[in-house]
Amino acid sequence: MSTRNDVHLGHKARKRFGQNFLNDPYVIDGIVSAINPLPGQNLVEIGPGLGAITEPVGREVDKFTVIELDRDLAERLRNHPELGSKLTIHEGDAMRFDFTQLIKENNKLRIFGNLPYNISTPLMFHLFEFHKDVQDMHFMLQKEVVNRLAAGPGTKAYGRLTVMAQYFCKVMPVLEVPPTAFVPPPKVDSAVVRLVPYETLPYPATNLKWLDRVCREGFNQRRKTVRNCYKALLTKEQLEELGINPSMRPENLTLEQFVNMANWLDANHSAE
């Protein structure tokens, strides 16, 4: 067996795909327990890789879907003695994948995966677009990204990703994972998070473009006052009418306050 630390089960990890293969049985068991896959559910794995999570999930269910960009790995799964007949394999990029094609009536998507860390944030933004059709999502991510997803106002980790994730989903960190659980070991700690989209959004925005804009502008200038940060969009009086203290910093605004600003702007400005 090779002594290289980037070869696992005969497959060399590809840097351009951000591949790190999970190989710690304790961690794998923890993830599968958190997902709790049941027969008949509409399960979708993103980036199954060498099947560390795919195999134990396959022991619990009859059929599920996987999306894999690496052709060699997709081929391996196709020829897998136990999984081959259970899997529907989509070869391609999850960032461009239209998840509506997997929707089944009264059977929402349950999405999971050990996401390549180099695309995890844009991929989550892509997945949020399908929130109405998703029951839950379980992802292995960089621990720092999980901290950002779960952060509260006023903390260093709080940012645009936090606000947009918490707009769509309840966020629950599940499990911390050390680099030694992977081949090759990544240079960062990892963690598993559960994202559960709301049936009814707690603070609905009338136009997501405005919400995205106030988040971007706020977090790009997080140390400025709200008044200075948004002076091209809202006056001090308008902010006060919305219950927002003009002298606070954008990093201290709550999700509800960001949505209130976005909805006011949508009603009173044409989006630029």
Swiss-Prot record:
GO terms for cellular component: cytosol. It is found in: Cytoplasm. It catalyses: adenosine(1518)/adenosine(1519) in 16S rRNA + 4 S-adenosyl-L-methionine = N(6)-dimethyladenosine(1518)/N(6)-dimethyladenosine(1519) in 16S rRNA + 4 S-adenosyl-L-homocysteine + 4 H(+). Its EC number is 2.1.1.182. The keyword Methyltransferase applies. S-adenosyl-L-methionine binds at N20, L22, G47, E68, D93, N114. Its main location: cytoplasm. Keywords: Cytoplasm, Methyltransferase, RNA-binding, rRNA processing, S-adenosyl-L-methionine, Transferase. PROSITE patterns: RRNA_A_DIMETH, SAM_RNA_A_N6_MT. It comes from the Bacteria. Specifically dimethylates two adjacent adenosines (A1518 and A1519) in the loop of a conserved hairpin near the 3'-end of 16S rRNA in the 30S particle. May play a critical role in biogenesis of 30S subunits. Belongs to the class I-like SAM-binding methyltransferase superfamily. rRNA adenine N(6)-methyltransferase family. RsmA subfamily. This is Ribosomal RNA small subunit methyltransferase A. It comes from Aliivibrio fischeri (strain ATCC 700601 / ES114). The gene is rsmA.
